[in-house]
Amino acid sequence: MAETNSREEELLRRIQELELENEVLKKKVAEVEYDAKYPKIDENFCLDEYKRYGRQMIVPEFGSLKSQIKLKNSSILVVGAGGLGCPALLYLSAAGIGKIGIVDDDIVDISNLHRQVLHTTDSIGMFKCDSAKKYICKLNPHVIVKTYPVRLHNDNAFDIVNDYDIVLDCTDTPAIRYLINDVSVLCRKTIVSGSGLKSDGQLSILNFNNEGPCYRCFYPKPPSAESITTCSDGGVIGPCIGLLGVSMAVETIKVLTGFYTKDNFKPFLSMYTGYPQQSFRVFKMRGRSDKCSVCGSFPTVSKEAILNNEIDYVAFCGKVDSNVLTPEDRITVQQFSDIVTRQSKAPVLLDVRTKEQFQIAKLPNSINIEWDPTFKKLESLDKYLPEDFDKDTDPVFVVCRYGNDSQLATRKMKQELDFKNAKDIIGGLNKWSDIVNPKFPKY
């Protein structure tokens, strides 16, 4: 009797086990049927991301969930976290790019904040790449951000660029622009390139799918160093440069989601102007140049040449040497201050900044004639001088913002206008603010 009861208990236990196994199998079958009906494109795509990116996924041109997955599985390298890089980074991280690299060795300064929208007042003194990462991680925790607080150069460019799918050139230096182009072409990376100054800018897609034209195809030789104006010298309207950065983000999304194909992509150059009326013009560009030194039929630019520093990008692009005067032709801001204090008659002071800068802040009794490399404007200086002014003996002091243009102007005045006693003020008005009058505004 006891043996019979034991056998029945064993059968009941086994039946319960089989019923449990059956329920597990039913659940697995249901999951398989569900997955067959609603396939998982990416098991790492969570419900939060559906909500986060839903408004862009429903746009027909975007490409729905598959395009969103492409963005998540993509990586971009942004070189320069400034006026172009910040808005591009802002929108691309919000759009769901999976991995973002940021290269910038510059430090956040208060003068950056009107246009470099990832940085805040609290970021002043931080590396720009680290400041940008801090903002991005708060905006979208699904994005992986890697920072490179270094200057891109021959030795590190290949190692950095190789880790990413696409490169955004958000720099403002010709030498770096050529380096980015050459390394990206040799690494078979597409480049989204932008530039901007004052209220104007332009953008293009280079080396698309490793078949489109590159930067050297359009510009085999760099512009003269004298013709290059930086944001600090020429100025920039924040929203204008920001619009270019946002446009770069749009083009990047098009490339990464496959909107552009080998068949439909045509090389282009988009040009934007903010004043007097905003306008965007798009120009068709030619294809690859067979004579291009990096992507042509007989290239002379190679990975080995770059790594061995056989290509000097700074020398290739040139630079303006502002140190053109002897020590005898220059005085310090303190020396000029002593002259002003000591003399009853105000010295002749020529300010060679633009009229816009002159209106911001100026020293008393200064004459404003903008420095012009052609030297035409300075020829009118005579009419501003006292009638008894003697070019052979009387001093005329020349000042600018940083002490660069004033050197060039002083040299021209001595060599071509016969001002024998022209003197450059070392360090310009910025140094005046540092040493003589801290209340004199810097801008």
Curated annotation (Swiss-Prot):
Q: What class of enzyme is it?
A: transferase
* Classification via PROSITE patterns: RHODANESE_3
Q: What is its main location?
A: cytoplasm
Q: Name one GO biological process term.
A: protein urmylation
Q: List the keywords (alphabetical).
A: ATP-binding, Cytoplasm, Metal-binding, Multifunctional enzyme, Nucleotide-binding, Nucleotidyltransferase, Transferase, tRNA processing, Ubl conjugation pathway, Zinc
Cite the InterPro entries for this sequence: MOCS3/Uba4, Rhodanese-like_dom, Rhodanese-like_dom_sf, ThiF/MoeB/HesA, ThiF_NAD_FAD-bd, Ubiquitin-activating_enz
Q: Which cofactor does it need?
A: Zn(2+)
Q: Which GO terms describe its molecular function?
A: adenylyltransferase activity; ATP binding; metal ion binding; thiosulfate-cyanide sulfurtransferase activity; URM1 activating enzyme activity
All copies of the Rhodanese domain together span 343-441
Pathway-wise, it operates in: tRNA modification; 5-methoxycarbonylmethyl-2-thiouridine-tRNA biosynthesis
What is the name attached to this protein's record? Adenylyltransferase and sulfurtransferase UBA4
Q: Which organism is it from?
A: Scheffersomyces stipitis (strain ATCC 58785 / CBS 6054 / NBRC 10063 / NRRL Y-11545) (Yeast)
